[in-house]
Regions:
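Surface-exposed loop and adjacent secondary-structure segments within mature catalytic domains
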Residues: 1-130, 134, 140
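Short acidic, glycine-rich surface-loop motifs adjacent to enzyme active sites
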Residues: 148-165
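Metal-dependent active-site segment of extracytoplasmic phospho-/sulfohydrolases and closely related
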Residues: 168
């Protein structure tokens, strides 16, 4: 329908809730396959997302986008971050890179700031990880350029985890 779309989460972007936005993988634990579903035109890509895929993906979970040899969990040696860069995504790996992104000059933004889930907000190092509010604001600024509108899935995933642990 022409809407821009994105996901923002303090959990891994391959975790169940954000993954349901863009992936048709049958099991939530298949996070390598879920990550591959984000790369437009790549093996495992969810073609229901159209030719260009999501415009914004921000959160945790870098391990599912990088191969074993680079410290990730991908056994297929695919470097999905490099593949996304090749598809014209602006990539931010830390809060400094993220803050430097100009939404007016950015059409596609990908940022996974931690290997797994992002830190609880009380433990977050602001130099390494943007906050949920910062990610959401930047995502909205990028997506709002689409005159037809946008859909943005925002999840405070770490509050869910804290509640599971009864540490909220």
């Amino acid at each position: 329908k022409g809407f821009a779309a994105g996901v923002v989460s303090t959990a891994r972007v391959t975790h169940a809730t954000p993954a349901a936005t863009y992936s048709h993988i049958c099991h939530r634990d298949l996070e390598n396959d879920i990550a591959a579903a984000l790369v437009p035109g790549g093996t495992g890509y969810n073609s229901a997302l159209g030719a260009t895929g999501l415009e914004v993906v921000l959160g945790g979970g870098a391990q599912f986008f990088t191969p074993f040899k680079s410290g990730g969990k991908r056994s297929d040696d695919r470097d999905l971050v490099a593949e996304l860069k090749a598809k014209s995504y602006t990539v931010a790996n830390n809060a400094t890179d993220f803050k430097a992104v100009d939404p007016a000059k950015t059409d596609r933004l990908f940022g996974v700031f931690t290997s797994s889930h992002m830190s609880y907000d009380l433990d977050r190092d602001a130099a390494k990880e943007p906050s949920l509010a910062e990610m959401t604001t930047k995502a909205m600024d990028v997506l709002a350029k689409n005159k037809k509108g946008y859909f943005l899935m925002v999840e405070g995933g770490r509050i869910d985890h804290a509640l599971h642990e009864t540490t909220a």
